[in-house]
């Protein structure tokens, strides 16, 4: 997947803040596409007549604000998910790096997959709540916000309902990782043959293509997971799910039997359309936030220009740079005091 490159000139909290803000911004802007995708996966009536008509039906039945159903929960989930993912990924990578500090691309992708599973496990109840909020009619809501949703689901359906379908996250990670690996290996060969220096644009292209292939391969697992998250016997129309089933295997069977194999890829169009604007906004917003932090840390003259500050060692970390500046100030102060004493004599 496309990744925002870690910059040693940022503190850990600044990196997390930049990723979080960029994620919130890109999620919020592309939320209408996410809503259409999830409603298509669940199988609600909005999406029976295709991608474009889904927007019309949602707007007619629930209004414009329906395109941001569940977005607040999705944004709140981003921070614990990112923190757990980053910490787990670092620990796994540290176990597999060689003597030179390098790690193979396959191991790095597997580490990313395992970190993703760990982060998903910790934040899975929030994902279930997001799906329920999107699947419900916001004009006649059963759930009102995060805490109310968690309490109602737990009270009416038990703790297991908050983890229903999690096994599909694990199963879907396999084709997802294979897809990422295949794309990155082939793209690396392509860039090397052209003998060009790797740029941010290439990283963006790699990320979009890898996301497209990996998400397409793992999409059936994601579709069944969304149906399992949304289905509930205590909700009107069983949560809006278009097939009735008992468990994961039966869900696959019923979807194929009643809707056809291609129904496992319902919502893929919205997902593909979302990839480029999502990653474009993510990268752009991250870079803007990073430049503000670099300015505050004393590495650049101003955020818009991104001109490096003369005389500043860009290889120093933020804490090292502050210590170095403090040392220079103390040294200058000491020299001034020595000069003052010499003048008196």
UniProtKB/Swiss-Prot annotation:
Annotated localization: Mitochondrion inner membrane
Family classification: Belongs to the mitochondrial carrier (TC 2.A.29) family.
Gene3D superfamilies: Mitochondrial carrier domain
Residues spanning the membrane: 16-36, 67-87, 109-129, 165-185, 204-224, 261-281
Name of protein: Solute carrier family 25 member 43
Protein's organism: Danio rerio (Zebrafish)
Source organism, top-level taxon: Eukaryota
Pfam families per UniProt: Mito_carr
Keywords: Membrane, Mitochondrion, Mitochondrion inner membrane, Repeat, Transmembrane, Transmembrane helix, Transport
Principal place of residence: mitochondrion
Solcar repeats: 11-100, 104-195, 199-297
A cellular component term, taken from the record's GO annotations: mitochondrial inner membrane
PROSITE patterns: SOLCAR (PS50920)
A Gene Ontology biological process term: transmembrane transport
